[in-house]
């Protein structure tokens, strides 16, 4: 299970993903999300860590390269050829470029003012991973939690929401508070169920996330006590030489 301290690194990505979904220009506008109200509780099991000492050592190297913004060191940790970058419209990797160049494009590492290196460090700190069925021998992180997909689809239809509106607690008994303050009254403690997130407007990343509980009550939880559903993922492969970054799944850099 991802610990709270590790998930906290993804706090900025959590809010970025919610904000991106709300601010992107769209074509035909979908119906507005249903107002806060009760919804069916869908059980969720957090992802498990990969039990492999070599993977832990690899992530440490990856984190060190990210902290130093050392592209040369990073290049040694990425496949030379065969890197994939899966987006909604297919594989966007440039097969004429090296793996590290494609990874840099996916994360926006060439943007000095961007968060690409911080995102890379965040990925490196996550010990979870799940297999990518269409690519044998590939695992991607952060791994998604386990839940009933059919029930989740029905839940999104009932609430007129999409994947980006949902999160899950990283541990049992996460405290929900009446206000976004550490000393605010605790209104309830959460079970291991999917949660509807309703972030408040604002450019700063807050300490608390506004949510709607299955009972339909609005409350606030510490942002590092939950994790998003459907996050971007970085993917790894392992061969005779060890672990390598082999691909990326998600929107990546907008440039």
Residue ranges and their predicted role:
Residues 1-7:
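Positively charged n-region of N-terminal signal peptides that target proteins for export
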Residues 7-16:
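Bacterial N-terminal signal peptides
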Residues 19-23:
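Boundary at the C-terminal end of the N-terminal hydrophobic targeting segment
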Residues 24-64, 76:
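Short, low-complexity N-terminal intrinsically disordered segments enriched in polar/charged residues
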Residues 70-81:
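Short, well-ordered alpha-helical segments enriched in acidic and aromatic residues
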Residues 82-99:
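Short, charge-rich amphipathic alpha-helical segments embedded
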Residues 108-168, 212-255:
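Boundary regions of SH3-family modules and the immediately adjacent low-complexity/disordered segments
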Residues 186-228:
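SH3/SH3-like beta-barrel superfamily modules
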């Amino acid at each position: 299970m991802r610990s709270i301290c590790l998930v906290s690194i993804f706090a900025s990505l959590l809010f970025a993903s919610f904000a991106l979904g709300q601010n992107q220009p769209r074509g035909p506008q979908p119906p507005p999300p249903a107002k806060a109200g009760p919804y069916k509780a869908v059980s969720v099991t957090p992802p498990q860590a990969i039990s492999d000492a070599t993977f832990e050592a690899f992530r440490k190297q990856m984190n060190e390269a990210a902290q130093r913004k050392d592209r040369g060191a990073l290049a040694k940790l990425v496949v030379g050829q065969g890197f994939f970058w899966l987006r909604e419209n297919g594989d966007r990797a440039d097969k004429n470029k090296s793996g590290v160049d494609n990874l840099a494009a996916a994360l926006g590492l060439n943007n000095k003012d961007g968060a690409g290196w911080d995102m890379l460090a965040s990925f490196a700190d996550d010990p979870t991973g799940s297999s990518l069925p269409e690519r044998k021998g590939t695992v991607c992180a952060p791994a998604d939690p386990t839940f009933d997909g059919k029930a989740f689809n029905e839940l999104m239809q009932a609430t007129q929401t999409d994947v980006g509106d949902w999160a899950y607690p990283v541990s049992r008994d996460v405290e929900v508070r009446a206000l976004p303050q550490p000393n605010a009254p605790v209104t309830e403690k959460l079970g291991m169920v999917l949660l509807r997130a309703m972030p408040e407007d604002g450019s700063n990343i807050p300490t608390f996330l506004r949510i709607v509980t299955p009972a339909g009550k609005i409350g606030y939880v510490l942002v590092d006590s939950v994790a998003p559903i459907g996050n971007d993922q970085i993917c790894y492969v392992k061969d005779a030489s060890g672990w390598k970054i082999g691909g990326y799944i998600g929107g990546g850099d907008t440039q």
